[in-house]
Amino acid sequence: MSKHYFCTLLMCLMFVVGAEAQQFTDIGADLTGLSEGSARWIDTDRDGDLDAVVMGEFFKGNQRGVQSNLYNNLRNDRFSRVSSGLPNLHRGDFSVGDYNLDGIDDIALIGETADGTRMATIYRGTAVGQFQPTGINFVPVRDGSIRFGDYDGDGDLDVLLTGESKAGPVSMVYRNDRNNTFVPVETRLQGVRRGVGIWYDYNLDGYPDIFITGADASGNPFSMLYTNQGIGFEEYQAGIIALKHSYAAVGDYDNDGDLDLLVMGEAAQSRLVTRLYRNDRGRGFSRTNAPFVHVRSGFADWGDFDGDGDVDLLISGESSEGPVTRVYENNRAGRFSDLSANLIGLHMSTGQWGDYDMDGDLDILIAGMASGYQYHNKIYRNDLLLAAQASPSTARGAESETDIFNNSVVVPERGKPDFLFVYSSAYTDLYNTGTKAYFLFISPVKRPRKQYEMEDRYNKLLRETYPQWSIIDQGNLLSIGKPTQAEAIKSRQRVIDEYASKQFTILEINW
């Protein structure tokens, strides 16, 4: 995610599935291959499933192009490109959030058009799933990042921006004063390009701090954590390695209640580095010995792909041996293992975990450039649940390595469990008290009459009950089905007990 980690507990997997049975399948979504851009999941049409927005550069023959594409999720592994209203950009980034509090996701974006014009602005989401310009203008940049986040705790989303302006690298915070008004905040942040700036509440005080990494005006690698003091940001010397062509992702890999920091990029002497720093409860950071591939010019995202209650790592970029994309399984106690997922190796890449097929596990959206200047944009379906439900001979049968990436694979329609419940989680100031807390939102057990009926009803009631839902830092919407009502009720209670043990407040979305 991104930037966030997912509170994902698939309690329906109460048995062990061998690593050889875990696989990701290229669904052959026929998306335009792009690089040097950004790819994110977003539910633009608000129908309860994840659509995809991907922006970047591509070549077709000798013709160069720049696109920002919206793909509508038609379900059953089918996506259709639709009109979005977004400008075509590359060398950019975008962030999803409801800046105007109207209950519809908007997009903040930066980048460069095909004619070299740089821009940084917000496009407002509409009820029909398209986007419209707002006239909001930030310092135009390319080769950077943009992130929504409520740094001042006033209930609306502010903006953190980094990148290369015409005057050089910048890093800026814009305060949201509502009514389409954003005001630049005096922060004295180091300007960077070819890197990223992220909101990161490392000290758990409820106010997002800032981590910035990238190349400074002289091209030197830079990394710094800035503590949110309420009236400004102050440098915090955390000992994080200086990097450029870099990326950062936070997630609680050790399940101790604070967010740890992963950084990747190019250090001094052109050395490629990927490091995981353990957050020692806001009192400092400890470097770990996690065995991740060293990369630059890529991305990383934390997510619990195997549903065992801890976050795993998706990472992609340029290694010393060429483009790579890997999934590392979190084996706890600080140990990770390469899943050997056989995903396409990419650099100048972007992507994110997300459950596009709503089957309760995390799938992968990824775009970038492979060896030989080949542009790709793929969706990989997580078949962990399918493998777990199959017999050992089926799950580990005669499929070759290439079989699971066959773009012509016929995907069966999602099954219809007899009894189902759905749930999601969030860390937020739900009641506008000034204090954030962890919440679990869970439905009753029902017997759906058609596919996705539960998810659709749940989403509708959740938005009606909690209007700020679209701006909340959410976990995935998960669904669990059981053949009998008794089993489903037992599974639901197990989920509630697990989250309650982690001090989540349980909120029932009933109908």
PLM segments and residue spans:
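Bacterial N-terminal signal peptides
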Residues: 8-16
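Blade-edge motifs of beta-propeller repeat domains
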Residues: 21-34, 71-89, 124-141, 175-192, ...
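Beta-propeller blade termini
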Residues: 37-46, 92-101, 143-151, 195-204, ...
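Glycine-aliphatic tripeptides that mark coil-to-beta-strand junctions in extracellular
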Residues: 48-54, 103-105, 155-161, 206-208, ...
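Short glycine/acidic-enriched loop and turn motifs that connect beta-strands
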Residues: 57-62, 112-116, 164-168, 215-219, ...
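Blade-level signature of beta-propeller repeat domains, shared across WD40, Kelch, NHL, RCC1
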Residues: 352-354, 362-388
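A short, exposed loop/beta-hairpin motif centered on an aromatic-Gly-Thr core
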Residues: 442-446, 472-486
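A short, charged, amphipathic alpha-helix used as a generic interaction element across diverse proteins
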Residues: 483-500
